[in-house]
Regions:
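A short helix->loop->beta-strand "cap" motif at the edges of active sites that frequently abuts
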Residues: 6, 27, 92-97, 129
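Substrate-binding/gating loop at the entrance of the active-site cleft, primarily
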Residues: 10-28
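Active-site phosphate-binding strand-loop segment of PLP-dependent enzymes
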Residues: 36-114, 119
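Hydrophobic residues in well-ordered beta-strands that form the structural core
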Residues: 10, 31, 99-101
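Short beta-strand->loop structural element characteristic of the AMP-binding/adenylate-forming
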Residues: 28-38
C-alpha cells in the first residue's frame, strides 16, 4: 500500500514502535500536529502534511489512532471524521491513500454508539481511499501478550478487496 522510501503519516502523539515498524519495511514516519490551539483535531495541519507528502509520493498510508487515542485519550468527533473524508474527496483520484483506523482502545472509549458513529462516515471515503480498521483483542479482551487482532478492509470494489488480500 506504499512504496519503499515513502513516509507514513501519523499524529505527533503516537505509539513509538511505529518508527521501528516503518524503518524495518523501508519507510519512515512523518507527523502532523494532532491538536490545534483550541485542543481540537487539527484538520489544517493534517491536510497540509498529507498534501505535502502526496506531492512527493503516489501513495500515502495514514494511521489515525482513535477513539481513545493512545496516549492522549482523544477521539475524533463525527465532524472531524467528515472533515477527513472531505479532505480525501479533494485529493487527486490518481493518488492512492490507505487510512488505517487503529481502534485498539475503542472498548475503553465510553458510549458504544457515540464512539462507533464514525464508521458510516468513513464508508463515504472515495474509491481511491482504502479504509482499513485495525482492532486488537489483546486490549479489548485483556489478552495482553497474545498479540491477537483483526484487520478489516472496507473496500468499495472487488479489485480493492483483492489488493488488500494480497
Amino acid at each position: 500500500f506504499s512504496e519503499a522510501g515513502d513516509k507514513i503519516l501519523v499524529a505527533d502523539w503516537f505509539w513509538a514502535p511505529y518508527n521501528t515498524i516503518a524503518r524495518e519495511i523501508g519507510r519512515s514516519v512523518e507527523t502532523f500536529e494532532l491538536f490545534d490551539d483550541k485542543r481540537k483535531f487539527n484538520i489544517k495541519n493534517f491536510s497540509a502534511k498529507a498534501d505535502s507528502l502526496l506531492e512527493k509520493q503516489e501513495r500515502l498510508v495514514i494511521i489515525l489512532n482513535t477513539p481513545a487515542h493512545n496516549p492522549t485519550g482523544y477521539a475524533l468527533s463525527d465532524e472531524d471524521w467528515r472533515n477527513v473524508v472531505n479532505y480525501f474527496s479533494s485529493v487527486s483520484k490518481e493518488k492512492k491513500i490507505t487510512l488505517l483506523a487503529d481502534i485498539a482502545y475503542i472498548d475503553f472509549a465510553g458510549d458504544e454508539e457515540k464512539y462507533r458513529s464514525f464508521l458510516p462516515i468513513i464508508e463515504e471515503a472515495p474509491e481511491n481511499v482504502l479504509v482499513v480498521i485495525a482492532h486488537s483483542l489483546s486490549k479489548a479482551y485483556t489478552l495482553y501478550g497474545m498479540r491477537c487482532g483483526a484487520m478489516i478492509c472496507m473496500a468499495k470494489t472487488e479489485e480493492i478487496a483483492a489488493e488488500f488480500k494480497r
